[in-house]
A protein has these predicted regions:
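Zinc-dependent deaminase
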Residues: 1-24, 72, 85-152
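Small-residue (primarily alanine) positions within well-ordered alpha-helices
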Residues: 14, 18-21, 31, 41, ...
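Short, basic and Ser/Thr-rich N-terminal targeting/leader segments
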Residues: 25-29, 75
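Short beta-strand scaffold segments in enzyme catalytic cores
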Residues: 29-37
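Short beta->alpha transition motifs characteristic of CBS
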Residues: 40-47
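Residues that line or immediately flank small-molecule/substrate-binding pockets and catalytic motifs
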Residues: 47, 81, 105
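Helix-adjacent hinge/juxtasegments
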Residues: 51-55, 59-92
Length: 152
């Protein structure tokens, strides 16, 4: 897949947020929402800190972007995430009407884009989101491996 210099920049921004999560003892996932080549929202996993199962990086980034635009619809936006979204996050991405999803590493246990499901390919969805993956995949996968190695 082709990735632009802008894609690399935005994924690196998401990766920095994932590293913050790692340091805060949260699963290291980060996400940024971009509109017109500007980051308008960012988030990292805060499930433990918030005692909230929905506080995934993607959800936090969508909330941040929605506040910035004062609109829950994020048409014309893209989201960069360090890990393949789960079903909850994939549905939120569709409902927010994002144009593009770029993610780094596949998530073989819960990834709903191309690992356990092809959620975005579902013709019944009322909005279509393009996606591509693999940018900084090794960096994300290694960060996750290191995190879970610490836990054992």
């Amino acid at each position: 897949m082709h990735f632009s210099d802008q894609d690399r920049f935005f994924m690196e921004s998401a990766m920095e947020l994932a590293k913050e999560s790692f340091l805060k003892d949260e699963v290291p996932v980060g996400a940024v929402v971009v509109k017109e080549n500007k980051i308008i929202g960012s988030g990292r996993n805060t499930v433990i800190a918030d005692n909230d199962v929905s506080s995934h990086a993607e959800i936090n980034a969508l909330r941040s972007a929605s506040k910035e635009l004062n609109n829950f619809r994020l048409n014309g936006c893209s989201i960069y995430v360090t890990l393949e979204p789960c079903h909850m996050c994939a549905k939120a991405i569709v409902d927010a009407r994002l144009d593009m999803l770029v993610f780094a590493a596949k998530e073989p246990k819960t990834g709903s884009i191309c690992s356990i499901d092809n959620f975005l390919e579902n013709k019944a969805l009322n909005h279509s989101v393009k996606y591509k993956f693999g940018l900084s995949e090794d960096i994300s996968a290694n960060l996750l491996k290191d995190f879970f190695k610490q836990k054992r």
